[in-house]
Structures are given as C-alpha cells and as structure tokens.
Amino acid sequence: MARRPAAPKRLNAANLTGLGADRLGDLLMQAADADPILKRRLRLILAAEAGADALALELDKRLTAVAASRSRVSWRKRPDLVRDLSVLSEGVETLSRLAPAEGLMRRMVWFDLFRGLTLRVKDPRGEVADLFETAAPALWQAADAAVRADPAVAEALAQAVQDHPMDYARWIGAGGEALTPDLARRLLERLDTASGVRGMRTAVRRLADRADDLDLWLSLATPEERGSPDFAAVMARRLLIAGRVVEARQALEGALSPSPANRRWTFGRAPDGPLRLTPAWEAASIDLMEAEGRKDEAQGLRWAMFERDLSAPVLRAYLASLPDFDDVEALDRALAHAATHADVETALGFLMDWPAHREAAALVERRIREVRSPLPLKADWAARLAQKYPEAAERLLASPG
C-alpha cells in the first residue's frame, strides 16, 4: 500500500521549506523581534556567512556587553542567560573553524566571563557552572587547532592560565582527552611551574598529568599528600606503570604508620592482626608485590583482605592468580569462611551476590537470629531463594531485619 503523504499542517522542516524563503524570512523576523536571544543568534549566523572578520566583530560586541554588565541575574532570568551564553559559544565554535587563532582568543574571552557571572548570578543548581565545564573540551580543541596553525598562540593561552590559575585548573580537569599531551607540554614550557600563586599548583599538576610528565607531577606532592595512604597508592601505581618499582615501594612506605622502618609490617599487617591501611593502599601494595616477583606474599595479602572484608573483587583476583584446579578448593574455603564471618549481614550479602545460594540458605537456617539491623534487600534475596530453598526464604522474610 502506498504511503500517505505527510500532513501539510505538521510542523517539520519539509513543510516549512514549502512556505518559501520570503515567507520564512518574515516569520523569523517576527520571532526574532519577540526573542532578543534568537535575534542575536541570527545576527551571528549572518555574520558567519560574511566571513571570519564579520563574525569576530559581532562576537566581540556581545562578549564585551556581557563582561561589562553588573546587574544581578535572578533565578527567573538565569535560563535566558544560559541560552545567551550557549548561543555565544556556538558562534565562537564557528569562528574557530573559520579562523582558529581568532576563535581561540574569543573562546578565552568567553571563559573569562565565568568569574564575573559567579558574583552576580543566582545559580543554586550549578547550571551556569555546568555550561562552562561542558564547554571545556571545546576550549582545548580550539587551542590545539590554533597552536598547530600558529605555535605563538600558545603564549597567550599560557598567560591566561598564569593570570587565572584556579579557573583554568577547573577547565583543564574538565577538558579530558581534548587537552592533548603535546598542548599540555607546550603550556608547561611557558608557565612558572614553581609559582606559589593560589591554584597554580593544581593547574600545573593537571597539565603534568595530561603531558605524562611523571617527575613534575610527583614534585608537586605535598608532605601531607605523601603521608596519605590513598594518595600514596596513586603515586605508587603511576610509578609502577613507568617501571619505577623501587620508587613505588618508597611511595607506599611513605604513608606507613608508625614507622616505615618496621619492615615486618611494611604492607599493613599490624602486630595485633587486622590490616590497618586503606583498600586503595592495600591494592597498590599487591601490585607492587607482583612487580617485585613476590607472588606468594601478594596472594597472602589478597586472602587476608578477603577474610576481613568479604570483598568479591579481591576474591576473584585471588582465584584468578591460582593454578588450574586449585581455584575450586580455594573457592570452597572462601565460601566456608564467609559463612562464619562475624558480621552476618555482610556474610549473607556476599553469598547472595557471588552467587552461592546454597551456602546463603544454610547461613539463614543457622544464623538468622543474629540479624540486628534492617536488610534492605531481604525481599529480593528471599525471592531468589524461594524456588530451591523455600524454608530459608520464609525464615528470611520473617526475620526482624
């Protein structure tokens, strides 16, 4: 059967095109007269048709006006401001395609608006801030294109980072892969990386991260950070990736308490038994042991962590490192340990999620009276046990938790 033609009253591009250019022009002018932001967008589109110089001039007018404004923006007017900024951003992106260096300069001016806007815009939901963070990749894409066309442009961008390091630290972090290692290195060459200006250390650290400059990144770590187990773990992982195993050990040991000289407990085994440091530190120390060829010790720490936390990822890593067939026996041992774990709620959650429903049902039968706190997933667990272990499911539903 032949398809019916589109209804002429339906609002779509094809039907609007049928109205003709003159009619559409009149309609757009009527809409623009009632919507200043639409009017500015149309002006930018027309300017782009005239060329890069005309578009740059039109952008400069509006960017200057927004920067000069001191009026407060209420929550009612905030959506219009976001629209206006978005239209400007689209215009800057168009200019970047036509003239990369000119586009980058306007993109930096657009980002410079952020500081003033934070002082006069009520933005409890962070819509304005989100707009700038979302545009961060466009900044670095424009910068990369401009610097490739004219390397001298990197000087202006580096000066912007130097002048406003806190803001640019934010845009560097939000830029992701759009900030290329080559561009990051060019900026670092032009920055005072030892500057004590507030925010500069963060900006330089993030640039060093993007530039794969591990030594510079490490040099920016404070004594407090080096003493933090989680940060020490980050340092160690980066050093291990670079093949610097000895330094990775030093990084981890730098976070030890009470003393790194107590080598017997280097990897977190306190004399009274429990592991003392953070999961990230422990995971990094396992990677270090593997890199040093201390496979048995790495496995020993994995097992100790599992015994303590009933962590499924840790157990999977432990089993994956065992020879063939040994993993079956080890899994039986792990499930038996889980069934006797001191925290019955943690034990039941682990067995249900693994999944090991037979062991979970047996645990319910033996230890359900030990439940002292609510079990948010009780109904779901009972439903999963009901078919094969109906008595355990009933007891679970009847439990006080």
Where are these regions (language model features)?
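Eukaryote-biased, non-catalytic alpha-solenoid scaffold regions
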Residues: M1-G401
